[in-house]
């Protein structure tokens, strides 16, 4: 069982990326994170939500769901969409790979998430959507 959890969902508009980032940051604040820890989580959320909007829904309207749970000092963060899915997860997770080169995307989203979180798991099914499960243990003291 979790010590605390929250769920939000919102329309896949780029304007909502900052809402998602701030919402998760506010939830995580109960762990009294360092500024670096908080920045890491906000950056990972930003990348995950941006991926859902640009790649999952291809800038069409859909719903992005975020679930955040705390167990002890660990944050479990799930970002999910019902978009087009990822055809080849291994390829998509390679640094500098982008499925949208015409948009001048950097292809670093998954690399950023892996760098700033302790773990990243990607589940995806073509034409059904993608689910990212990220975890981070907070070392700061309450």
UniProtKB/Swiss-Prot annotation:
Pfam family, one: HATPase_c_2
Name recorded for this polypeptide: Anti-sigma F factor
Transmembrane segments: none
Keywords annotated in UniProt: ATP-binding, Kinase, Nucleotide-binding, Serine/threonine-protein kinase, Sporulation, Transferase
Molecular-function GO terms, alphabetical: ATP binding; protein serine kinase activity; protein serine/threonine kinase activity; sigma factor antagonist activity
Nucleotide-binding listed as a keyword: yes
Species, as recorded: Clostridium kluyveri (strain ATCC 8527 / DSM 555 / NBRC 12016 / NCIMB 10680 / K1)
UniProt cross-references to NCBIfam families, sorted A to Z: spIIAB
Biological function: Binds to sigma F and blocks its ability to form an RNA polymerase holoenzyme (E-sigma F). Phosphorylates SpoIIAA on a serine residue. This phosphorylation may enable SpoIIAA to act as an anti-anti-sigma factor that counteracts SpoIIAB and thus releases sigma F from inhibition.
Gene that encodes it: spoIIAB
Gene Ontology process terms (BP): asexual sporulation; negative regulation of sporulation resulting in formation of a cellular spore; sporulation resulting in formation of a cellular spore
Superkingdom: Bacteria
Family as reported in the entry's similarity comment: Belongs to the anti-sigma-factor family.
Enzyme class: transferase
EC number: 2.7.11.1
Ranges in a coiled coil: none
Presence of the UniProt keyword Nucleotide-binding in the record: yes
Catalyzed reactions: L-seryl-[protein] + ATP = O-phospho-L-seryl-[protein] + ADP + H(+); L-threonyl-[protein] + ATP = O-phospho-L-threonyl-[protein] + ADP + H(+)
């Amino acid at each position: 069982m979790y010590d605390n959890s929250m769920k939000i969902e919102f329309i896949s508009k780029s304007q909502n990326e900052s809402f998602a980032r701030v919402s998760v940051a506010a939830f995580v604040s109960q762990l009294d994170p360092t500024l670096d820890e908080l920045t890491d989580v906000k950056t990972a959320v930003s990348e995950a939500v941006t991926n859902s909007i640009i790649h999952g829904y291809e800038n069409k309207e859909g719903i992005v769901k975020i679930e955040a749970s705390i167990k002890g000092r660990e944050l479990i963060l799930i970002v999910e969409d019902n978009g087009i899915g990822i055809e080849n997860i291994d390829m998509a997770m390679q640094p500098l790979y982008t499925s949208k080169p015409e948009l001048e995307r950097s292809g670093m989203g998954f690399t950023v998430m892996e760098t700033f979180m302790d773990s990243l798991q990607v589940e995806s099914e073509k034409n059904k959507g993608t689910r990212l499960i990220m975890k981070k243990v907070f070392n700061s003291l309450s």
